[in-house]
Amino acid sequence: MRHTFAMKLVFFAPLATLLLGYILSGSYVQLSAYNWWYTIILPVLVSMLSASMIVRERNTGMQNILCLPVSSSKIWIGKILALILLTFGTNLLLWLITTMVGFTANMEVSPMNGLVGCILLALTFLWQIPLVMLLTSLMGYFPALILSVGANLLLSTIGAEKSWFFLDPYAIPSRVVCPFFGMHPNGLPLEEGSSLLNRAAVVPGVLISLTLLILMAWVGFRLFWKGVRKYD
């Protein structure tokens, strides 16, 4: 996947997000870039990376896997780990360039809050990796991509500001970063004294997301392995 368009997005997506934030908000580029990142750009990026990681095997009838002297479980876990590294890497790149620009524009988000926020985004998006991989193995690239991106766009803000936000895992990322980015999930600045500035939701949100990661990885492998055995 090193030379694919999806891999290039790991580097270009943060740059495009920063440019978009600057065009739309000028000196308030930080807030705009972070908001566009977790509401649209990052969901699309994670979905494309995850789907691209598995689509080649599906298109070749799983022969790429069957020919390897390695267990399918190790291949599945290895793909997930590779995507985890890419997800953290692209989030840290966004933080780096956004923070650098912040020194020349309005520093609306401090470097430390920006770093914590980007790490939280990575952690709370990880569970979608095995889910999209599984969907791709079952449905193909474009159906899985459309379903994943559509779910993010529709569900990421539903209930994000409610006490029951944890029931909607797609809303967890936009909720847990509120106190660090200082804005509502819709991008509007938080009012002083807003309950969304309370960081109590962070740990439960991360724990739920990581639990889903483990669950999706296990369920995904079981169903993926059944698909591999059909071609054996």
Regions found by a protein language model. Name each.
Residues M1-V10, K226-Y231:
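Aromatic- and glycine-rich beta-strand/loop motifs that create alpha-glucan
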Residues L9-V10, M139-G159:
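Pore- or pathway-lining transmembrane helices of multi-pass membrane proteins that form conduits
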Residues Y28, G150-Y231:
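Terminal transmembrane helical anchor/hairpin motif
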Residues A33-R56:
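Long, hydrophobic alpha-helical segments
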Residues I65-S72:
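Short helix-to-coil transition segments within interhelical loops
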Residues S72-V101:
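Selective transmembrane-helix segments that form parts of the transport pathway or gating/packing helices
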Residues I97-C118:
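Membrane-interfacial helix-loop-helix connectors in multipass membrane proteins
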Residues N113-P143, T211-V219:
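Hydrophobic alpha-helical transmembrane segments of polytopic membrane proteins
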